[in-house]
Amino acid sequence: MAAGGKSFLADAGYGEQELDANSALMELDKGLRSGKLGEQCEAVVRFPRLFQKYPFPILINSAFLKLADVFRVGNNFLRLCVLKVTQQSEKHLEKILNVDEFVKRVFSVIHSNDPVARAITLRMLGSMASIIPERKNAHHSIRQSLDSHDNVEVEAAIFAAANFSAQSKDFAAGICNKISEMIQGLATPVDLKLKLIPILQHMHHDASLASSSRQLLQQLVTSYPSTKMVIVTLHTFTLLAASSLVDIPKQVQLLLQYLKNDPRKAVKRLAIQDLKLLANKIPHTWSRENIQALCESALHTPYDSLKLGMLSVLSTLSGTIAIKQYFSSAPGTAATTARSFDLVKLAQECCYHNNRGIAAHGVRILTNISASCQEKDLLPLEQDAVFGLESLLVLCSQDDSPGAQATLKITLTCMVKLVKCRPHLSQSVVESLLTQLHSAQDAARILMCHCLAAIAMQLPVLADGMLGDLMELYKVIGRSTTDKKQELLVSLATVIFVSSQKALSPEIKTVIKQQLENASNGWTAYRIARQASRMGNHDMARELYQSLLTQVASEHFYFWLNSLKEFSHAEQCLTGLQEDNYSSALSCIAEALKSYHKGIASLTAASTPLNPLSFQCGFVKLRIDLLQAFSQLICTCNSLKTSPPPAIATTIAMTSGNDLQRCGRISNQMKLSMEEFRNLAVRYGDLYQSSFDADSATLRNVELQQQSCLLISHAIEALILDPESANFQEYSSNGAAHVESEYERRMMSVFNHVLEEVESLNRKYAPVSYLHTACLCSAVIALLKVPLSFQRYFFQKLQSTSIKLALSPSPRNPAEPIAVQNNQQLALKVEGVVQHGSKPGLFRKIQSVCLNVSSVLQSKSGQDYKIPIDNMTNEMEQRVEPHNDYFSTQFLLNFVILDTHNITVESSVIDSNGIVWKTGPKTTIFVKSLEDPYSQQVRLQQQQGQPPSQQQQQRTAYSRF
């Protein structure tokens, strides 16, 4: 997680980066002061970019005040530009420090004679509702403008009223009656009523307000039966119910009633849309009767478009707790079989419908029922689901239209889900996929390959059977000329790598390389090499990286590819390990380390300030240290042969009282080795905690490396250092845990095998014998024989999150200390901005930011003060929740000792699961604690032998107090 640690925008005139921000603001200010309208508009519309680049309050406050001035004195077009900027920069509004001044300048335009100017001002106030929710003058202006005779102004007032109602309970309660009168008033035009009704969705601040709004909406639905009025009223009704969480079952019943009884298609469509919203948001409130009513409507409707909508709602519900409620035995229905339920009948009927969308929802419902309901009478539905999925697969794989591809995605997702929870169905599913692969369109083939890879990951037993078909297809695709060909080559290669569980045969390598030479570009070859590294096929990966070295234009890319080639070569060296040949194991590890050291040098050269490759470097350095620790452990085990315990070792152990002495010098070496593995486990834990943006597979990979270190340290302790107190219960693996990848499956298998061997030896033999050292060496070789997987985060970052910190006060020069008197406290303000990439919160989201402030005395003071240790350092921690990606807090720090103090502010992130991630950044400033003038004067007088005056004595006593 990259982060900018430099302090900027703290105090006026401080910091180099702030000068950049100030110069940018001055440049825009020059444009605002221009006499040309075009230049003024250009300056205004460039403000959002400025806010994005410098998102701290001091600049944003200055910028918004300048914009408010333009709004006050400019023409309506400029005001409109300022309004657009304000709406685009909504999340920065709360950083305005002088809210009163900003509002005052904007609000002055509300008294204009121009109704358009007033309308723009009302929209401006509405856009600022989040920072001025309780401003009474704004409330009054909105009420007044609702009575205006100018339509533009009234519409603007409606916009502002909706925004203020969402933010302010008082405004919502006060405006509710006014809105009610206007809606029911005969003088209000219908189009205005349609705009007023949606305001009622915000009347959810308390139960009584929600109830009165609901009654009004109920009256409107019955009083105004026109299509537009019913649609707007029903939708507002739904949004109010979803926000207030009151009367949701009643709302579901009302919508179902309109769906069943109202003949208008538009109303039915709206009812379906709102039912879908409620099914997504609150599925647990749906009763069995509600689902039954929806099933009946779907069974009886003659219109495919409506049936599709209803099935969409039912398929959403089928993936939630609502499906269990539906199948739970109702009174008097104990003997009902699964196939007699209307939902099942509907799904079976729709599975083979001529409309692809309807068929997709039908099979999705059957899949969800099979996955979530384990009752015996529901088991026959599995086969129905498989047949439905296979028929859809045949239909959609021949069609490359976007609709067919969307349906195919649903079908393949259902297949993976069904195979995961019903493994006995996997054989037929895989066979149907392989059969269709040959005749399918290329776009469909890519999706089908992804599906096959997902199934093979879950059920490796099926993988070997796929290889023949896949290799045939790979040869065929080489002759294809479609634009999807490159993507298909990558997808197929991935499935082949997953299917080849141990190592690629020479024939497979030859076919893949031949097709790449004939038909692919460099990027395709790189992607295939990346997948090979991920699946542990390092020999293939090394050859592909080698072939790409001469095809890149940038030296950074060259060094990156060269490092990947060296890492692949290093891991390939480890595949030659043999179980009982420990000397060859040492030479293999030495060869691997040689390549790893070359690779880390290239990797360091590939890094840039913007892309420091910190995770990659950290992961590889740990791998190097782990290999060295394994090598050292094998050497230590071998030393039992070259340097066995002396004959008097038992006597020495008895006289010294240290039982380990009877093992000779190997005991001390083993102790050092155990500590080394524990330190490596801690370092892997640190790498895990610093990888906030990593995907779950990468994190699991790091976790497995950490567990292998802990396993070896535990084995050393249990076999040699402390066999008496060895506890095997806490290390036993959880068999029920779901394994996501072949690499994890093989590592877990090794862990279990090693633990069993260690436990068996621990019970049978006393330490230390050749059996014990052989067991440790075998454990090391077993771990190294599992090919390392380089997961996605090593190659690409899908989620990017960074934190920028700004401290105030901050010095002009980072090396200069801030002066503080020792009898005062320093108020340190810490502000921060969370910056995201293109996919924020893809893997995990920031719940809060933990700020840790600590101060350390740089050198001891010359004077010998007897001060408690608590006053010498500051250690504080605060948790703050970012709002619109901004957070701010303050710390009060004491500096009693006269000297230079080093203050460190470190931020870490807490995600929505409460896990702490050590993401940084870490910022440091210096504070020089100075003696206050009065104490200095008293001390000097005492040194000169002059008694202080009475008044001075009183002040001294007071200051001491």
Swiss-Prot record:
InterPro entries xref list: ARM-like, ARM-type_fold, INTS7, INTS7_C, INTS7_HB, INTS7_N
Cysteine disulfide partners in this protein: none
Region (Disordered): 937-961
Domain of life of the organism encoding this protein: Eukaryota
A cellular component annotation (GO) from this entry: INTAC complex
Single GO biological process annotation from the record: snRNA 3'-end processing
Subcellular location: Nucleus; Chromosome; Cytoplasm
Keywords assigned: Chromosome, Cytoplasm, DNA damage, Nucleus
Primary subcellular site in the record, as a coarse category: nucleus
Nucleus among keywords: yes
Regions of compositional bias (Low complexity) in chain numbering: 937-955
The family this protein is said to belong to: Belongs to the Integrator subunit 7 family.
Function: Component of the integrator complex, a multiprotein complex that terminates RNA polymerase II (Pol II) transcription in the promoter-proximal region of genes.
Subunit record text: Component of the Integrator complex, composed of core subunits INTS1, INTS2, INTS3, INTS4, INTS5, INTS6, INTS7, INTS8, INTS9/RC74, INTS10, INTS11/CPSF3L, INTS12, INTS13, INTS14 and INTS15. The core complex associates with protein phosphatase 2A subunits PPP2CA and PPP2R1A, to form the Integrator-PP2A (INTAC) complex.
The protein's name in its UniProt record: Integrator complex subunit 7
Species in which this protein is naturally found: Gallus gallus
